[in-house]
């Protein structure tokens, strides 16, 4: 290749080593300087006035490459600045100092752009000079290894521009020291350079904080996450090596506590508690319970102090006192009592102008109802209607406990009856005022004075004769003297000064409860203090839950109930008993604890009152000859009060030989599980105002289970009494039928001794029972083997006739002995 040949420009490539360029250009001398970042050497390029076409083309390409690198660095700087701005926005920096830092970064960007623009103008001047030059360019490289000379040769303002020179990289790669060598090796060694822009480095958290810090020099250094992690692990190892100081606590121990609960209360390991129990000779796991004494020993051995509490303390949250200034006047609660069909429900119909009796079978109220009547003057009276039948005595007694006034209804044409006397006794026991309403005065031929005289016998003395009981003749059907009855109620209520606290948590009593399909458990309650609201947590007996819905006696939904207001609520988990007290608690955990405590008490009480079997009964039962028979029953009813009354009445039936066993009693229709239980135990299902479902009925027919339906309670009781009477053993009674005197003894071959006798009284029957008396002492009792009249066998011989008698398996008979004849008669027993 000759110098005159035209050398085609080829693309230059960068070498393996990375170069950082601090370039300065002198327009007068045509000198450029390059700095190698790795070797810290300075490469100085001097241009002469002469040049060639090859050099010019290389210079053009080099200038274009320099311009490309400058543009790339400019774009890279702008991109990094935008990243910093976004990071600052995402971290939501509200510090004004940080905002000022961003403004500083923006100013730095503007200054950098202003520094790059003059450099671009210098490149244009250099390009023009290179186009006019015709001489060769002498390239000499002066390597300066002393680092101290670099700052003096490189202008300070060019330090902020970082450019990688492709020429320096090419020379470093191929070992070219002069431009002549470059011309010689242009065809063989020079390769077109490829511009490789480095990917932007990922901004670290520490770099971001340094950039955004107030210290412009960046001297504030943050610790890396790895160093923080190492410091934390070191601190943990240091703490682990130190023995933790044990904390001793005051432990509250109830009557019974679980091993795991005791360990949690002391903040001890369960294994340590079990070890202490093993030292005491007790083997228990974490789920088992121990008594309070054992728990106290364990806690004391582990260094804790003990505070003993009674299990009944869980009910202390239900106790609250009312302040006098919070009391407000409330409506009176009146209970209506009396005998069957004396007009109690009709009286309520007249008072509240609704037909309640239409829904009652035969006019007999089957369960308690609570109603609120508002009078013309705006005052209200709450009535509780208790059934009059004797089977509901327990329900009636509960009604008397929650009432302020008792109205005893007596029919003028019927007078005082058994249930009337019982109602009087309940009212006296409750210590509440009594008003006697003599009903049905509209009927002819009545004698009110006779009724008053009967009341005097039971110490019910009217005001007209100096007593303290108001006796008012009324007619519920004709609505006669109802206003006088209302005035008497309000007068007594005013004298009693009835007040209650309407503030705070509600409390009261359960009137009735039942299960209705599609609605769940429905409970009728009477609020006695406080205000009951929706979503309150209520506990009644062993039942608890959240109040989901409240309706008043008219069927309207309400959101709160004040004292003396009866409401029906939904939301309890089970059916409470009529007469159970209800309270409001803070949360469901408290309600659950109280319910569990009450269930344990009821279970212990049931076990303690269970009848003990005598040794004789156990032997008889083991041998299969037990005289005690059982009648298993399953009772289902429409409301809890009816089921409870039926159970109580049946258990009171007197019988020493028949044990009535109620396997299950509940509210709601008969289910398949009831049928399965009845089949397994050979029980009778007694249904009161409920029916069996289709599936339960099919199962009962298949298993041949007896289901009996009733709608009146005393019919049910009479039927069960008849069944129990049929199970009783009949009474065997001896009936004397005659006697004979032995006058002569005959010995007959193959027959034995025959007593020739004379019938002195009654008749003698063959096969009847006989007693042989000698000197009025019974020496034998058996049966007649033979009865003959002369040589003929006869069935009986009457008084005044002679006969021959032979005894079964007995021949020690003498003349003068007396034979008594009797029959055994079985009689059916009744309860």
UniProtKB/Swiss-Prot annotation:
GTP binds at residues 338-345, 385-389, 439-442. GO terms for cellular component: cytoplasm. Residues 338-345 are annotated as: G1. This is Translation initiation factor IF-2. It is found in: Cytoplasm. Belongs to the TRAFAC class translation factor GTPase superfamily. Classic translation factor GTPase family. IF-2 subfamily. One of the essential components for the initiation of protein synthesis. Protects formylmethionyl-tRNA from spontaneous hydrolysis and promotes its binding to the 30S ribosomal subunits. Also involved in the hydrolysis of GTP during the formation of the 70S ribosomal complex. Residues 329-499 form the tr-type G domain. SUPFAM superfamilies: Initiation factor IF2/eIF5b, domain 3, P-loop containing nucleoside triphosphate hydrolases, Translation proteins. The keyword Repeat does not apply. Residues 475-477 are annotated as: G5. It holds the Pfam family GTP_EFTU. The lineage of its organism: Bacteria, Pseudomonadati, Pseudomonadota, Alphaproteobacteria, Rickettsiales. Residues 385-388 are annotated as: G3. Keywords: Cytoplasm, GTP-binding, Initiation factor, Nucleotide-binding, Protein biosynthesis. NCBIfam families: IF-2, small_GTP. Residues 439-442 are annotated as: G4. It comes from Rickettsia rickettsii (strain Sheila Smith). GO terms for molecular function: GTP binding; GTPase activity; guanosine tetraphosphate binding; translation initiation factor activity. It comes from the Bacteria. Residues 363-367 are annotated as: G2.
């Amino acid at each position: 290749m000759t110098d005159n040949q035209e050398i085609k420009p080829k693309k230059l490539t960068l070498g393996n080593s990375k170069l950082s360029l601090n370039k300065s250009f002198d327009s007068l001398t045509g000198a450029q300087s390059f700095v190698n970042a790795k070797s810290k050497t300075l490469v100085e390029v001097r241009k002469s006035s002469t040049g060639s076409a090859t050099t010019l083309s290389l210079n053009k390409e080099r200038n274009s490459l320099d311009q490309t690198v400058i543009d790339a660095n400019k774009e890279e700087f702008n991109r990094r600045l935008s990243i910093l701005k976004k990071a600052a926005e995402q971290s939501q920096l509200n510090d004004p100092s940080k905002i000022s830092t961003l403004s500083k970064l923006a100013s730095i960007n503007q200054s950098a752009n202003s520094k790059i623009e003059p450099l671009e103008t210098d490149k244009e001047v250099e390009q023009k000079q290179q186009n006019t030059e015709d001489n060769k360019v002498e390239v000499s490289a002066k390597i300066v290894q002393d680092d101290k000379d670099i700052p003096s040769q490189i202008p300070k303002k060019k330090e902020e521009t970082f450019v990688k020179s492709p020429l320096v990289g090419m020379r470093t790669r191929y070992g070219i020291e002069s431009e002549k060598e470059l011309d010689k090796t242009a065809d063989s060694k020079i390769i077109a350079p490829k511009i490789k822009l480095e990917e932007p480095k990922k901004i670290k958290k520490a770099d971001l904080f340094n950039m955004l810090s107030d210290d412009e020099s960046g001297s504030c250094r943050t610790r890396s996450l790895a160093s923080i992690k190492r410091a934390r692990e070191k601190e943990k190892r240091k703490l682990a090596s130190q023995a933790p100081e044990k904390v001793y606590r005051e432990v509250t121990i109830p009557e019974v506590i679980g091993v795991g609960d005791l360990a949690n209360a002391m903040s001890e390991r369960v294994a340590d508690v079990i070890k202490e129990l093993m030292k005491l000779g007790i083997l228990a796991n974490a789920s088992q319970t121990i008594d309070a004494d054992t728990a106290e020993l364990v806690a004391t051995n582990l260094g804790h102090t003990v505070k003993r509490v009674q299990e009944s303390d869980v009910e202390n949250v239900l106790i609250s006192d009312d302040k006098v200034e919070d009391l407000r006047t409330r409506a009176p609660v009146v209970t209506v009592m009396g005998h069957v069909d004396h007009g109690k429900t009709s009286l309520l119909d007249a008072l509240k102008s609704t037909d309640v009796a239409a829904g009652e079978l035969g006019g007999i109220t089957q369960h308690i109802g609570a109603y609120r009547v508002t009078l013309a003057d705006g005052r209200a009276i709450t009535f509780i209607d208790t059934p009059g039948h004797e089977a509901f005595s327990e329900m009636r007694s509960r009604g008397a406990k929650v009432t302020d006034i008792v109205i005893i209804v007596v029919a003028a044409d019927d007078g005082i009856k058994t249930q009337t006397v019982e109602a009087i006794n309940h009212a006296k026991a409750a210590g509440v005022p009594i008003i006697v309403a003599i009903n049905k005065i509209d009927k002819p031929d009545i004698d009110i004075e006779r009724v008053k005289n009967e009341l005097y016998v039971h110490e019910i003395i009217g005001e007209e004769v100096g007593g303290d009981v108001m006796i008012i003749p009324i007619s519920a059907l004709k609505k006669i003297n109802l206003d006088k009855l209302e005035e008497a109620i309000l007068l007594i209520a005013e004298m009693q000064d009835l007040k209650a606290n309407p503030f705070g948590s509600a409390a009261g009593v359960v009137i009735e409860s039942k299960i209705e399909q599609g609605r769940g458990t429905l409970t009728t309650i009477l609020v006695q203090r406080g205000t009951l609201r929706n979503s309150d947590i209520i506990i009644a007996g062993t039942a608890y839950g959240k109040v989901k819905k409240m309706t008043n006696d008219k069927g309207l939904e309400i959101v709160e109930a004040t004292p003396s207001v009866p409401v029906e609520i939904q939301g309890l988990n089970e059916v409470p008993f009529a007469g159970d007290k209800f309270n409001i608690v803070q949360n469901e955990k408290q309600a659950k604890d109280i319910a569990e405590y009450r269930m344990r008490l009821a279970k212990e009480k049931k076990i303690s009152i269970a009848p003990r079997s005598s040794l004789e009964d156990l032997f008889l039962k083991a041998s299969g000859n037990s005289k005690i028979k059982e009648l298993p029953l399953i009772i289902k009813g429409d409301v809890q009060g009816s089921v409870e009354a039926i159970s109580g009445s049946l258990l009171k039936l007197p019988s020493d030989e028949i044990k009535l066993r109620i396997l299950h009693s509940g509210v709601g229709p008969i289910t398949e599980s009831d049928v399965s239980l009845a089949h397994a135990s050979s029980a009778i299902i007694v249904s009161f105002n409920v029916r069996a479902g289709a599936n339960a009925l099919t199962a009962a027919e298949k298993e041949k289970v007896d289901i009996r339906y009733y709608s009146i309670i005393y019919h049910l009781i009479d039927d069960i009494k008849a069944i129990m009477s049929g199970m009783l053993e009949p009474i065997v009674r001896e009936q004397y039928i005659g006697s004979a005197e032995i006058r002569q003894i005959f010995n007959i071959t193959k027959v034995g001794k025959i007593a020739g006798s004379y019938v002195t009284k009654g008749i003698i029957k063959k096969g009847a029972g006989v007693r042989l008396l000698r000197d009025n002492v019974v020496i034998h009792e058996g049966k007649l083997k033979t009865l003959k009249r002369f040589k003929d066998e006869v069935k009986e011989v009457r008084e005044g006739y002679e006969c021959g008698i032979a005894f079964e398996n007995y021949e020690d008979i003498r003349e003068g002995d007396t034979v008594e004849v009797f029959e055994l008669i079985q009689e059916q027993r009744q309860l």
